[in-house]
Amino acid sequence: MKKISLYVFLSLMFCNVSFGGILSEVLKKFEKTSTGCIEGDCENGYGVFAYENGDKYVGEWKNNKSHGQGTITLKNGETYSGQWKNATPHGQGTYKFFNGDKYVGEWKEWNFHGQGTYIYSDGKSDKGIYKNGELVESN
């Protein structure tokens, strides 16, 4: 009985080491393909890029940066969809917050900047000219 138990124990240890090694290799391959450019051309074209923090960008690229039209979906569910310049929102775009608020308008380097409308989840809104993220003139 002791011989059988030892044989079973050694067999299980071998299987665990073998399959554990295989599983480890499979997981490493998955990790490599689940972040970075996962589809298309993320250098100079149209591609999908998954960031390690869970964010994902789908859109146009120029010189390895988001540039042109694109959408980023953040890990928390918020999205920005619109124009990009050198990896920052720049130009016309829409940002949807996880609480239901939304900003539609002009952007400059991740800030509301220019003509835009901030729409609250209750339907109220602030329309006007924004500068560096702040409403400076209502209209």
Regions found by a protein language model. Name each.
Residues K3, N16-N139:
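Glycine/tyrosine- and acidic-biased, solvent-exposed loop/turn segments at the edges of beta-strands
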Residues Y7-N16:
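Bacterial N-terminal signal peptides
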